[in-house]
Amino acid sequence: YDRGRGSVLSDKIKTVRNNIPDKEVTFENAWGICDEDIFNKMITVADKQYKDGKPFFNFVMTTSNHRPFTYPSGKIDIPSGTSREGAVKYTDYALKQLFDKARTKPWYKNTVFIIIADHCASSAGKDEIDVANYHIPAFIVNMPEKHNQKIQKQCSQIDLWPTVFSLFNWHYESDFFGKDVLASDFEQRAFLGTYRKLALMKKEKVMILS
């Protein structure tokens, strides 16, 4: 178990860490294995859970978008280790490989994929709040019986789960600070933070809360 921590859904749900054998690793650097390898492992785990008749929630963190931005050679037209743009393009490549494989699986039709950046408290430095560094995309993919749409609202990562649960039409009780961004009464705002400061942003104005 991952340090005994539970899940956002229930303390009864435990986080299990999966080790990856060396034979399943084609490329790695100081941060970990390449995106293709971790996605392949995710599919293997999903296959086993489906075969065993168990639902699954797989959480994956990719490593390519970290310095020195290295990844397997011959995958894209930007040499490994030269730029962040190359790392992002490789991740795009790896995601395409993931979805090409996932679509062939029997569990795909009942599986929702969420892709989002994982900005941490230090992403904008220790002191200044650089708003541009917190502007990130999020994708909700393969949501059953939902039409594609592009949402351009000022919101935060904390709003992700309430929005997803709303799309599922789930009724639940929680201590979430986030809100459903698709709700008619959603008030646009964003929370930003570093190790030292927490800020609230509304439209073009930013207020330091602490």
Positions of the model-derived regions?
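Solvent-exposed soluble domains appended to multi-pass membrane proteins
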Residues: 1-210
